[in-house]
């Protein structure tokens, strides 16, 4: 199989689809890998590293896309839609429930798109989303602490406080991978941390994990309002695989927050959980202020720490990439149910229910679409 690794073009996206070690594994399995010039430089992988791993380095972006399978990090931008072709396997994060134009382009060009975030194990965990959820969760607490500083628009609070001064209050909505990792860092900074989740069993697990050092609260509209309005930092970390994020925090709740408080919407790439995060921001211009509250809505948070993120992502995605390359997508889907759940579009059909519902499109199951 011929595989392409293009350079990411999203604002300040410095991750790369595969590290040199991942490329080497594919080449050793008999596949041809084309890597776009400087694709890995943002993660401090140079062209020579890929060349030594067995890749062919190409300067033309079109050539990297003229392959059997493209492995990326983030969803293609509009300038890349022109490279879509029937039968192309696209393996990347897609978050299509918030990307109607991209979804339509994939359907029109009959691309076989596999989204990292919807690959799901029997225990409902997301093995290809988890590494970046861990990174984004940990970053969210660090970023929140930074933007609480007065010079960054915040109210001038130190999350850990000092003797005789209260700690900063951090509320995390969602107790999954991202929320749990946000709590770890917030606790490490000395903050007063509350996690809200809809699953009582998960709250029990979190209570055990943190030894009672975090407040675990059932998530419902009344509790969300109560804890949001008294918080200095609110982190949104709710995920429904493949579907748009639920808007759990209303504009009225935001209006009740203190001036200079901060919200971090980790779920913004799926539409966000705050009614007031009505636009996606970038690493170049990461925040805006609405109702006196600092809003951080960067959709590719892990892109700011690309070396860590690329290595973590490569560890998770490489086994699936090898499966697709070695077996072909049909046999790979047949033999691996979690991978088949990653299929979002197939030759003109939407094969993810959450995406179909988001845009009122016709849905076909993977088995029906592929006639497995």
Curated annotation (Swiss-Prot):
Keywords attached to this entry: NAD, Oxidoreductase
Organism whose genome encodes this protein: Staphylococcus aureus (strain Mu50 / ATCC 700699)
Cellular component aspect of the GO annotation: plasma membrane
GO biological process terms on file: L-alanine catabolic process
Pathway: Amino-acid degradation; L-alanine degradation via dehydrogenase pathway; NH(3) and pyruvate from L-alanine: step 1/1
Keyword ATP-binding in record: no
Protein name: Alanine dehydrogenase 2
CDD domains, alphabetized: L-AlaDH (cd05305)
Functional note: May play a role in cell wall synthesis as L-alanine is an important constituent of the peptidoglycan layer.
Gene3D superfamilies assigned to the protein according to its UniProt record, in alphabetical order: NAD(P)-binding Rossmann-like Domain
Record-stated family: Belongs to the AlaDH/PNT family.
